[in-house]
Amino acid sequence: MTMKRDLLLLPLLAFFLLTTACKDRKNTIRIATKPMTEQFILGEMLKLLIEQDTGLAVEITKGGGTSNIHPAMLKGEFDIYPEYTGTGWLVVLKKDSLLPPDTLYETLKKEYEQKFHLKWLSPYGFDNTHSL
C-alpha cells in the first residue's frame, strides 16, 4: 500500500488533548475545533459533557487548523481540542511514516507528553476512515 492510501485508510481516531493551561481561567475551559462539521459536533459534545459533569463554563473557538491550534495549545490559549492520531504523528511530530494503529496511539501519547507536556486522553470510540 502507498503512504497516501495508508493515511486515508488508517483509522484516524479523534482524541482529546488536554493541558494544564486552564490555571489562569480557573472556571472556564477553552475548546478549539478545526473547520469541519465533524469537529464542530465534537466540540459541542465536549462542551455539553464538561458543563454537565463539572459545572465549569466552556468557550468554543471554531475554525482553526492544526498549524494554528497546536501552537495556541502550547501557549495556553486553549485547554482541549479533538485531534486525529495521523495528523498528530505526521504533521505535528513530522514523522515520515505511520505506525500500525495498535502502536500509534501509545507512541504518540508518550512523544506528546515528553516533547510538549500535552496529554492525549482516551479515544472517542469511533474512527474516521474517509471511506464510503
What is each residue range found by the language model?
Residues 2-9:
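Bacterial N-terminal signal peptides that target proteins for export
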Residues 26-38, 56-62:
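Short, well-ordered beta-strand elements
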Residues 18-21:
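C-terminal motif of bacterial Sec signal peptides marking the signal peptidase cleavage site
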Residues 68-70:
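Short, hydrophobic alpha-helical packing/hinge segments within bilobed ligand-binding/sensory domains
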Residues 37-56:
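Short, polar/charged alpha-helical segment
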Residues 86-132:
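Contiguous mixed-secondary-structure segments that line small-molecule binding/active-site clefts
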Residues 74-83:
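Alpha-to-beta junction loops
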Residues 36-40, 62, 66, 81-82, ...:
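Solvent-exposed, acidic/flexible segments
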